[in-house]
């Protein structure tokens, strides 16, 4: 089961379940404050001296089956080459979790995303399914990460996809760009993804 959620809901959930064994994977320097175990491909052990830190050196996560009550994967999945295997590993090591991803709009707007991200992410609200496709750069980016973070304060639902899952992560991966590549204007992406607060300016 996977469905939409919010960061606020997740923070409250974890705060109310402080006995949970929580893993944060691929968080860089911004681990969830409730995580007990941190893992990343970088050696960040000095930064997380008050946590258990494990450096990742292989695709397979170094944890037992269902070792964790909850796993956080925030802005990680879009970087992973073998995304099917990564999702299987999340399901294997934890009972449930939170996934945070950039929307297709944010992915195209941000300079750093152009070379670092491999996948576009959407969510099918009818079938409750994560829809993954090869990234296509529809237009040249115009924003920095720092600028986008400021926009997130107002337009978070338009720029960030927030999902909670339990038992399994229903998803589909389309690795071909042939069916997905269409010239999409900045205006059309804004209309599709931006919240109603901003849409009035683009009618």
Predicted regions and their residues:
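S-adenosyl-L-methionine-dependent methyltransferase catalytic module, highlighting the catalytic core
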Residues: 84-203
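Long, low-complexity intrinsically disordered regions enriched in Ser/Thr, Asp/Glu, Pro/Gly
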Residues: 1-18, 185, 191-202
């Amino acid at each position: 089961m996977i469905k939409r959620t919010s960061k606020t809901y997740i923070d409250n959930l974890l705060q109310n379940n402080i006995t949970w064994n929580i893993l944060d994977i691929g968080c860089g320097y911004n681990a969830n404050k409730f995580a007990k175990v941190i893992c990343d491909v970088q050696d960040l052990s000095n930064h997380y001296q008050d946590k258990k830190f494990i450096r990742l050196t292989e695709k397979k996560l170094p944890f037992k089956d269902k070792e964790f009550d909850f796993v956080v994967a925030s802005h990680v999945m879009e970087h992973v080459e073998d995304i099917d295997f990564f999702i299987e590993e999340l399901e294997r090591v934890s009972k449930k979790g939170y996934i945070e991803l950039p929307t297709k709009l944010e992915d195209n707007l941000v300079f750093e995303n152009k070379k670092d991200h491999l996948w576009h992410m959407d969510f099918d609200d009818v079938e409750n399914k994560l829809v993954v496709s090869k990234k296509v750069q529809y237009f040249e980016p115009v924003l920095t990460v720092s600028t986008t973070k400021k926009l997130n304060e107002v337009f978070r639902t338009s720029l960030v996809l927030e999902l909670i899952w339990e038992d399994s992560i229903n998803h589909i991966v389309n690795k071909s760009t042939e069916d997905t590549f269409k010239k999409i204007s900045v205006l059309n992406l804004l209309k599709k993804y931006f919240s109603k607060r901003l849409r009035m300016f683009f009618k």
